């Protein structure tokens, strides 16, 4: 089974399969250690009010509707570029946000991109920092991460035991345990609940 076929599944399964994947981009290689799964609109198989695709397809979120293996990029708060990998069957909205990674090679490149004062464990901690470290930009939206000549290339590895918990900073579906991470990794970001989210237990 080729890598992209392993992502033609529900978003949570895809998220598990993306943990431990090796991401290579513009002189840097990194191993993914934290991800978040996102579903789609109310009439889809995985309704998710926190997903950009919840209100249906549009020019900005079209990549979330497939095909699997395409990179969906967006700006968080209009500033930081964040990257997701589309999953599920073509036409069905689902994606996995790449939240954190450990840099395996290209440390000097990352240091220049992130700044001399940034510690190695924080190079790619958080989705905006991950994209900054690897040089992922908005121009990468829609590219095939499994194509050999892709500027952002992904190679899946063996599934690894992981921990699950609520997603960071979402105000809807705030209790859903769709954030996954590898235990013991200092690169994993801290959990912060959105101040707009209901109290714990008051959301799905």
Curated annotation (Swiss-Prot):
Swiss-Prot/TrEMBL keywords: DNA damage, DNA repair, Hydrolase
Could you say which EC number(s) this protein's record lists? 3.2.2.-
Respond yes or no to whether keyword DNA damage is given for this record: yes
Q: Please state the span of the N-terminal signal peptide per the UniProt entry.
A: none
Report the top EC class in one word. hydrolase
Q: Which SUPFAM superfamilies match?
A: FMT C-terminal domain-like (SSF50486)
Which Gene Ontology BP terms does the record give? Answer: base-excision repair
InterPro entries of this UniProt entry? Formyl_transferase-like_C_sf, MPG, MPG_sf
Task: Cite the GO molecular-function annotations of the record.
Answer: alkylbase DNA N-glycosylase activity; DNA binding
Which PANTHER family does the entry link to?
Answer: DNA-3-METHYLADENINE GLYCOSYLASE
Q: Which family does it belong to?
A: Belongs to the DNA glycosylase MPG family.
The entry's protein name is: Putative 3-methyladenine DNA glycosylase
């Amino acid at each position: 089974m080729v890598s992209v076929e392993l992502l033609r599944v529900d978003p949570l399964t895809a998220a598990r399969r993306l943990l431990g994947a090796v991401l290579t981009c513009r002189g840097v290689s990194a191993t993914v250690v934290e991800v978040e799964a996102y579903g789609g609109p109310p009439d889809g198989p995985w309704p998710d009010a926190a997903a950009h695709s919840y209100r249906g397809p549009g020019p900005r979120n079209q990549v979330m509707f497939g095909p699997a293996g395409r990179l969906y990029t967006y700006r968080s708060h209009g500033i930081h570029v964040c990257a997701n990998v589309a999953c599920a069957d073509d036409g069905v909205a689902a994606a996995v946000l790449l939240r954190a990674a450990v840099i395996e090679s290209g440390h000097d490149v990352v240091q220049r991109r992130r700044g001399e004062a940034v510690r190695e464990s924080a190079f790619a901690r958080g989705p905006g920092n991950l994209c900054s470290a690897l040089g992922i930009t908005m121009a990468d939206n829609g590219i095939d991460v499994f194509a050999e000549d892709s500027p952002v290339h992904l190679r899946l590895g063996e599934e690894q035991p992981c921990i699950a918990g609520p997603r960071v900073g979402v105000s809807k579906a705030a209790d859903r345990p769709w954030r996954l991470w590898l235990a013991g990794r200092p690169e994993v970001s801290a959990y912060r609940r959105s101040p707009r989210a209901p109290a714990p237990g008051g959301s799905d």
